[in-house]
Amino acid sequence: MSQTLNASTLLAVPLAPLVGSALAGILGTQFGGNWIGRRLTHTLTILGVLIAFILSASTLKSVAVDGARFNETLYTWMAVGGLKMEVGFMVDGLTAMMMCVVTFVSLMVHLYTIGYMEEDEGYNRFFAYISLFTFSMLMLVMSNNMLQLFFGWEAVGLVSYLLIGFWFNKPTAIFANMKAFLVNRVGDFGFILGIGLIAAFAGTLNYTEAFAKAADLSALTLPGTSWMLITVICICLFIGAMGKSAQFPLHVWLPDSMEGPTPISALIHAATMVTAGIFMVARMSPLFELSETALNFIMVIGAITALFMGFLGIIQNDIKRVVAYSTLSQLGYMTVALGASAYSVAVFHLMTHAFFKALLFLGAGSVIMGMHHNQDIRYMGGVRKYMPITWITSLLGSLALIGTPFFSGFYSKDSIIEAVAESHLPAAGFAHFAVLAGVFVTAFYSFRMYFLVFHGKERYDQNPDAHHGHHDDHHDDHGHDDHGPHESPWVVTVPLILLAIPSVVIGYMTIDTMLFGEFFKDAIFVDGDKHHVMHELADAFHGPVAMALHAVTTAPFWLALAGVVVSWYMYLINPAVPAAIGRALRPLVVILENKYFMDWFNENVLARGARALGNGLWKVGDRTLIDGLLVNGSWKLVGMVSAWTRKLQSGYLYHYALVMILGIFLLMTYFVWLNK
């Protein structure tokens, strides 16, 4: 018999980081007179996130071991007709897992920030923001209704805007945060349309009530069209996910988010904003399962993102941007799994990816600190001798990312590839090719970065920006010195070690329970009569050890190994090869360097085109038709008519007599003509 979780305990989970954020933001900044210093600021915010993590871990234990569940409304905000707008929580396996991932990664980022942002003037403000980010994501994942989900959705978007543009005196950061904000508005427009359609046709925003009416919705068409209503709803919802989870073509904001400080890059890419779209689709699985058209659309978008965003990672030289493009590619893998109805596999990869991606981002930040804020991997090399902890943990994160057997990424990534192979959707063939090819691409660019940073010759003195401030921030006073690389302080390396542990073991420990047990039983719905993917995976699974051993005979393992070997040869053994290939394939390199010209298209076709259209409508519609014809034309016409009638009013009696005689004559003529 399942137990019920305590509402007050659950409420404390999001409120703890919110209180820490409020105290830091009010008392630790100029807004509140800087009443508290840096030490008290990070103590309060870390304490809030630590409390949230402990309570989340306790909740996960109750859900996984005791079968506890919670689905209640805490507060009714308003009721409009029969539509209630409520604040409530739904806690099941999916929610509990997300709560732990969000709070643990956030806790690591908070600790890391103490060292990374030590000399930044906005230290207290940054801690207030990242705690607020944590609160927003927790409210999103714990929601039991779509209105609260939407508020959490918009809150993470707002705080990401503040954090990407944290250094507001840096023009590129301001451009990046505005870009992220605007691109996400496009996705959010679709998202709110989907929610509105559910509210209009299901009459509720509550998950449980809406899912109970899913079958009824699937029988309806959109009024005035022949489109299936459930398909329109699902595609609208997924457009929202395309924005938040950076799926092609709404992916363009994510690489530019690297303009923010490294700690927030880790939090955005690992556990908060970009995972929101994947979580939302998994939560809405009872709806998506009823539309194969939507599932095909999702699978195609995910496959394009997984493969083609990986290609862009190959030509990046900024260490953070390499990791950013790997995030785009891995989000594509998760999306492909959603399209294959393998929702549990998608969120399983979300979980494993959160740990090793946070590790890789924080490891990149540690390298940036050790290299005195140089971010160009072409001017590094041999760093492992100076930064052993960062080296080992980054290696573990890279091995997890490429899906090395027994590492966490292997269990989730290989499960995605197998799920797509078992899918019978029309898009599955293309998607399977994309995720297989993506294995080689991921291994290649991941170990290109690894080899260029940690191995080979030291190339620090070759950096033309060494004395020109090629930095990712403005807070390091020793960024221009001539000292060599150095290991980061313990407050930076300890989070790396703590993240490396789940990056290695969490997949091995949890795959049986999460994918083939009943952990997601009440949280995720799969129509087994139509979609047999999870049944096929369960039949082929014989334990994590057997799965890892069997992997050495499969294509993904050899593709990953080939990617590592090719990268090793090109960047350590024969460094002249990349330049030669670049010259031979120059047109392709130009396309990749310009990111498929998506930014050019968005700016010159969409943005400038919309502006030109607006100017045209203003000139023709507003100035010519409205002002020129209707407004100004009407008074000119009145003036002309009045000027003409004024001439008739001469004031002379004989003029009026003449008009009267003419009028009588015309009337008599008319009547005579009628009587003929």
Per-range role (PLM):
Residues S2-A16, I36-L47, L83-V101, M139-G152, ...:
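Membrane-entry segments of alpha-helical transmembrane domains in multi-pass membrane proteins
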Residues R69-K84, N206-L222, S412-S423, T513-M547:
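Membrane-interfacial helical/loop segments at transmembrane boundaries in membrane proteins
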